[in-house]
């Protein structure tokens, strides 16, 4: 008969011998700006590295969920169309929930492997594994492009007759006082009237 301590030691010895970190898992905040009719995710490479996932796999997921085309340019991602930080963040979080986080222990210490042509999420922290199912687009919360009181990073596309900088986000035309064409500015939306939005630099 083994005593409790010896049984515990034997059980611990059979646990996966992997290095994990107790540090809080933090997804980098997407750094976005608009360039013409495209949206640039400037720190895409950093996000993929943090998630420990193949950039091509992450990019394929994002373009599918956003319903657009895109490409990777160095360490940044370029999406056709205008998207907000909220839209990108929601989809990255959905990707993490499905393709990164272990459903048993809640840790990000996982790998994607194929077993008999089935994509499986294998956890190196607790040893659990589960098949990955394609997430439906309806599971991702899509928010309004901009909201009053929200802050956004924009690229100024033009200057209006009154000297205000003008940027486009989705269907909205955003006016930014004191901004010049080509500037990348962070603004707070003060008021929205129809498809027009009035902001101030922050």
Swiss-Prot record:
Pfam family, one: TRAM
InterPro entries linked: IF2/IF5, NA-bd_OB-fold, TIF2_bsu_arc, TRAM_dom, Transl_init_fac_IF2/IF5_dom, Transl_init_fac_IF2/IF5_N, Transl_init_fac_IF2/IF5_Zn-bd
Example of a GO MF term: translation initiation factor activity
The keyword Protein biosynthesis is annotated on this UniProt entry: yes
Keyword Protein biosynthesis: yes
Domain TRAM positions: 145-202
This protein's UniProt keywords: Initiation factor, Protein biosynthesis
Subunit structure: Heterotrimer composed of an alpha, a beta and a gamma chain.
Function field: eIF-2 functions in the early steps of protein synthesis by forming a ternary complex with GTP and initiator tRNA.
Family (UniProt): Belongs to the eIF-2-beta/eIF-5 family.
Record's protein name: Translation initiation factor 2 subunit beta
Annotated gene: eif2b
């Amino acid at each position: 008969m083994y005593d409790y301590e010896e049984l515990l030691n034997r059980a611990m010895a059979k646990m996966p011998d992997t290095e994990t970190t107790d540090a809080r898992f933090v997804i980098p905040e997407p750094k976005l700006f608009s360039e013409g009719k495209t949206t640039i995710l400037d720190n895409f490479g950093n996000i993929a590295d943090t998630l420990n996932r193949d950039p091509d796999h992450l990019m394929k997921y994002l373009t599918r969920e956003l319903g657009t085309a895109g490409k990777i340019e160095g360490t940044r991602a370029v999406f056709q169309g205008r998207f907000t930080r909220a839209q990108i963040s929601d989809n990255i979080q959905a990707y993490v929930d499905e393709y990164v986080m272990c459903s048993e222990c809640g840790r990000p210490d996982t790998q994607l492997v194929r077993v008999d042509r089935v994509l499986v999420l294998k956890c190196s922290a607790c040893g659990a594994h589960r098949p990955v199912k394609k997430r439906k687009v309806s599971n991702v919360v899509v928010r309004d492009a901009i909201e009053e009181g929200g802050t956004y990073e924009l690229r100024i596309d033009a200057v209006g007759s009154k000297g205000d900088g003008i940027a486009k986000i989705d269907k909205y035309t955003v006016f930014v006082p004191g901004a010049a064409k080509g500037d990348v500015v962070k603004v707070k939306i003060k008021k929205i009237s129809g498809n027009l939005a009035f902001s101030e630099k922050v």
